Amino acid sequence: DIEIFMYGLISILKDRGDQVFTIIATDGSKGGSDKTKSLIKTRKIEAINGLKTLSKPIFLDISDGELGDNINHKKIIKQNIFKVSPDIIITHSKNDYHSDHRALSLLIREAASHYVPILYCDTLMGVNFQPNFYVDITNYYQGKKDAILKHKSQNPERFVDLFELMNSYRAAQCNAPKGSY
């Protein structure tokens, strides 16, 4: 879901010369109608292709729907954060619609908030989220769209429609011209 929620900002950071690491916590095993092991492989390939211009993702392979506030997951998250030693972390909001996103937000906050600044991305359709700042990603619109469309197993067009609406709305809040994201 990096492509939907964070791709624009991460692209900006990459273009200014920052080293970018992307970590995907869950395996995607329940994110589609195919519930076989092949779905995990498909989702991994889609993530690699979607993030190709940003970084090679690190996969933690925790089962979809099982990410939670437990000692093992805390350890895995903390180890991976310290392995890449980030200057900032971008993660999901604690108010996100998805239980794995909420769990990841909590785990990251507990693992890293005393060591590195954490930025929380917008929620799907902005529900229960009030931005503290806005980032113009208009120049990265096509890259974000292309990255989302790499996820063929998830009917990606619906997410493109949602991101266009959400990002247009946030741009309008800043009085940006029509066609801004």
Report each predicted region and the residues it spans.
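Metal-dependent de-N-acetylase/amidase catalytic core
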Residues: I12, D34, K56, G68-Y181
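Active-site rim/loop-helix segments in enzyme catalytic domains that contact anionic ligands
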Residues: D1-V84, E110-H114, D146
